[in-house]
UniProtKB/Swiss-Prot annotation:
Keyword NAD: no
Protein name: Coiled-coil domain-containing protein 71
Stretch list, region Disordered: 81-106, 209-256, 322-404
Composition bias, Basic and acidic residues: 377-386
Positions in coiled-coil regions: 279-344
Stretches with biased composition (Low complexity): 87-106, 332-344
Gene (UniProt): CCDC71
PANTHER family membership: COILED-COIL DOMAIN-CONTAINING PROTEIN 71
Species for this entry: Bos taurus (Bovine)
Length: 452
């Protein structure tokens, strides 16, 4: 895992990732992003290197941010950068901001502190040090203290970088801290060139409150506390010009003049502006209430319209359902009438048992009987006694059932008991099937429990 001087093996991440805690954490996160199911991070790093090499072979040019590009110093050493390197890397003071001073010991960034950096540092400083002041005033004090510390290090009493406000910041990252503090400032660079003196304002890094001297200069602090939250360009210039002035009388005179010109600090103008602001706020609140009432009325109308549409749809569905019920009832009545018409006989007042005679008469008309068939039917009628004839008569299913079910009579079973003879069974089968059966019939005995 050590760095090879001859560059025989290329590493995806340089040696700073193996020296500092934050670097190790960043390397592990990068490897886990490349292969989330990895069990061996060394093998995953080799896979990452091979993947990048394959991209180079295919013609792509992957850009790898080195730690020197990010933090401003070489990654092959754990020593913090010297003051000359920082001054060489930092831009000129007239362009953006002065270079920051580096302490003797390097501060390591823990893994959990990395999430604090995207938040604006000037806002955090304003909340931690002076909550009553506006943000632009705190930012001006921060930049003034940084410029004083960089320009006057020979005095010995210069204020250093506020490390207690940024506990996890690298030495080389303080340049980015200064650039981040420059964002909310709207004043030109010329207003920041003067050095603030300790007579008007003092910034103590131990307690981090803003101390103001007693006397007439106290009105200067009150004016800063009473300043409106929304800072205009004129208000920012007023605060920036008033800071470097020495002496309480000059600050008070400047305050009275600027109050007459701008009308944004102290005095009766503040009351007038407050009244106007209150009226504007009341008018805005009234407009908002009117909008809310209009929105509620529109919503009520929409709900009423939707309710009416639902009621009409429900009534229409009920009418359609009633129509369908009537149609079904009518169809059912028609079917019942047709069924009754099918089951009733078509004869003119003949009894129910006349179907057999009518069928026999029709067959007699279509085909004349022979002499042998007449004699056979007469003999069968003589053989039967009157008692048996009456007993076997109602048993004929042809007489009891209508013409619709006459086709199913060949599947009808003939029940035989002890009193029935073979001739009776044969005659009953002949009546049902209307065929001349042979006199040989195979009979099976009934079960003992069904016998009478």
């Amino acid at each position: 895992m050590s760095v090879v001087v001859q560059h025989v093996e290329e590493k995806a991440v340089h040696s700073w990732s193996r020296i500092s805690t934050a670097g190790k954490k960043a390397l592990e996160e990068a490897l886990l992003v490349f292969n989330p199911m990895s069990q061996d991070l060394s093998a995953t790093e080799a896979q990452l290197v091979a993947f990048l090499q394959g991209l180079r072979d295919d013609g792509f040019q992957p850009t790898i941010l080195r730690s020197g590009d990010v933090y401003g110093y070489s990654s092959c050493t754990a020593n913090p950068p010297s003051q000359t390197k920082l001054q060489a890397r930092a831009p000129t003071p007239a362009a953006t901001s002065p270079p920051a001073s580096a302490p003797q010991t390097a501060v390591r960034l823990p893994a959990g502190r990395a999430t604090l950096l995207p938040m604006p540092l000037s806002g955090r400083l304003a909340k931690a040090s002076t909550p009553g002041l506006a943000k632009h005033a705190t930012t001006n004090l921060l930049l003034s203290s940084l410029k004083q510390s960089s320009a006057g290090r020979a005095q010995g009493a210069a204020v250093g970088f506020p490390t207690h406000l940024y506990p996890g910041v690298y030495p080389a990252m303080r340049l980015s801290v200064v650039l981040e503090a420059l964002v909310p400032i709207k004043t030109p660079v010329a207003c920041l060139g003067a050095k603030p003196k300790a007579q008007s304002l003092q910034l103590s890094l131990g307690d981090s409150p803003l101390k103001v001297r007693k006397g007439p200069g106290k009105r200067l602090g009150n004016a800063q506390l009473k300043a409106p939250r929304k800072a205009t360009s004129k208000g920012s210039k007023c605060l920036a010009q008033r800071g470097p002035r020495s002496g309480p009388r000059q600050g008070a005179g400047l305050q009275s003049k600027t109050c007459k010109v701008t009308g944004s600090l102290g005095g009766p103008r503040v009351k007038d502006g407050g009244a106007l602001g209150t009226k504007a706020a009341q008018a805005k609140a009234a407009c908002a209430q009117a909008k809310v009432a209009q929105t509620q009325a529109t919503a009520t109308q929409a709900r009423a319209k939707a309710k009416a549409v639902r009621a009409r749809a429900k009534a229409k569905a009920a009418r359609i359902k009633a129509r369908e019920v009537r149609a079904r009832a009518k169809a059912k009545a028609v079917q019942a009438k047709a069924k009754v018409a099918r089951t009733q006989p078509r004869g003119r007042g003949r009894p129910k048992g006349s179907i057999q005679g009518r069928t026999a008469r029709r067959s007699r008309k279509s085909r004349p009987e022979t002499v042998g068939q007449k004699r056979k039917r007469t003999e069968e009628a003589k053989d039967l006694s009157p008692r048996k004839r009456t007993r076997l008569g109602p048993r004929s299913p042809k007489v009891q059932l209508g013409p619709g079910t006459a086709r199913l009579l060949k599947f009808r079973a003939i029940k035989v008991d002890r009193l029935a003879s073979d001739d009776e069974v044969r005659q009953q089968a002949q009546r049902i099937l209307r065929v001349n059966l042979s006199p040989v019939i195979r009979l099976q005995p009934l079960p003992p429990h069904s016998a009478p």
